[in-house]
């Protein structure tokens, strides 16, 4: 089991030691299977942007930028498209005037509904916003194969959304995010 330290996380290793001890198995005779064919891609993006903390400085009343705008902005930063933006002027870990301009422009493009506590836009508006900026967009249901395909084979982050529904079917509290990595266990 001690050789498993080279490929297991500390917590996984400790869990195996605990199980081996529980069952009275000598550690030197405990076998751990390892598949070196696991495939991991990502994270593809380096940006760590948020809806507030300076990123919303150019939004109306400095209300939160909205998850739609932040997710779209990070994807656009990854592709550095459209070319009209100062991509080199955008830091990955803090707001700059260039990233603030991009986020505000996306907010306008998606008809962002700004609010004091949260801001939002629909999936349809996000799709039209991407298309207006020169992106080819296809709307699909969440399908892990499609998501992994985009990440593994095309090296592209995936814009995703989810909605929560109450018991009578009224949609509320949607959210948008980017999936920019995946791990496949063989």
Identify the residue ranges that each predicted region occupies.
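Conserved active-site-adjacent core of cysteine acyl-enzyme catalytic domains
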Residues: 88-186
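Active-site-adjacent structural segments surrounding the nucleophilic cysteine of cysteine proteases
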Residues: 1-119
